[in-house]
Amino acid sequence: MSETSPHRSGSVAVIGRPNVGKSTLTNALVGAKVSIVSNRPQTTRHRLLGIATFPEGQLMLVDTPGLHREQKRAMNRVMNRAARGSLEGVDAAVLVIEAGRWDEEDTLAFRVLSDADVPVVLVVNKVDRLKDKTALFPFLAQVSEGRTFAAVHPVSALKRKGLEALVSDLLKLVPEAEAMYGEDEITDRSQRFLAGELVREQLMRQLGEELPYATTVEIERFAEDGALLRIGAVIWVEREGQKAIVIGKGGTRLKDIGGKARLQMERLFGAKVFLETWVRVREGWSDDEAALKAFGYD
């Protein structure tokens, strides 16, 4: 954009199936970690606003849970509702897919966007992982056939490649307006919420396939004590056997999870953190709408 271009500001929903890199893309555009990431599908469970500020304008990026077909448990239904609800009132949307792959859940995400009547930018992520680079353009042609996109951008969110052109096109789709947030603001979520997410991220990263799906984190205490933040985090599971998995032999796994989460908090919050963690059991919470609401699910 030229220096005489008007300032633009608007909201953009980031939509796609699980594990395509929506949160990595959001973090890359914001320039800071506002959404947790892991290799585990459905890492993102809540809508989260990431604020990306540029000289030409500001993009309010609504990171969302991955749209998926599974509807059996209440938590699956809640996450799908959160993803669909993120499209209300946005100026544009980004459909994130993985380079070289389009499946039924990508089709589901596209249909949801088609019903929303907003301009859609297709972001083809993870192009750095394509072994045969010549396969990219035939894949783009195949995906674009019979589907309308405002723009198509191959990117690597992890390596921050192709993002400048993407930002330029997204800013063209939002209205002329002043920024709604200050330059130093990166999310509308509280530090308390982010603390819980950072603990959950370490659970996913360290337990991998061992991690029970029905695991969530509740921050019971978040208090400033001079220059120190005192945080108490409860990890909820559904069975005693799952509790033992999270704690690990002699408590070593829980200690490691807490230690790594604390370092992430100190980096994000810019303050020393004293973190305590506990593991508790609440049977059937992931299929209980009231329990989900109590734990902060939309």
Curated annotation (Swiss-Prot):
Pfam families: KH_2, MMR_HSR1. Residues 8-176 form the Era-type G domain. Gene3D superfamilies: 3.30.300.20, P-loop containing nucleotide triphosphate hydrolases (3.40.50.300). InterPro entries: G_ERA_dom, GTP-bd, GTPase_Era-like, KH_dom-like_a/b, KH_dom_type_2, KH_sf_prok-type, P-loop_NTPase, Small_GTP-bd. It is found in: Cytoplasm; Cell inner membrane. It is a peripheral membrane protein. Residues 125-128 are annotated as: G4. The keyword NADP does not apply. The keyword Cell membrane applies. It comes from the Bacteria. Keywords: Cell inner membrane, Cell membrane, Cytoplasm, GTP-binding, Membrane, Nucleotide-binding, Ribosome biogenesis, RNA-binding, rRNA-binding. Residues 42-46 are annotated as: G2. One of its GO terms (molecular function) is small ribosomal subunit rRNA binding. Residues 199-283 form the KH type-2 domain. GO terms for cellular component: cytosol; plasma membrane. Its main location: cytoplasm. Residues 63-66 are annotated as: G3. CDD domains: Era, KH-II_Era. Coiled coil: none annotated. An essential GTPase that binds both GDP and GTP, with rapid nucleotide exchange. Plays a role in 16S rRNA processing and 30S ribosomal subunit biogenesis and possibly also in cell cycle regulation and energy metabolism. Belongs to the TRAFAC class TrmE-Era-EngA-EngB-Septin-like GTPase superfamily. Era GTPase family. HAMAP family: GTPase_Era (MF_00367). Monomer. This is GTPase Era. It comes from Xanthomonas campestris pv. campestris (strain ATCC 33913 / DSM 3586 / NCPPB 528 / LMG 568 / P 25).
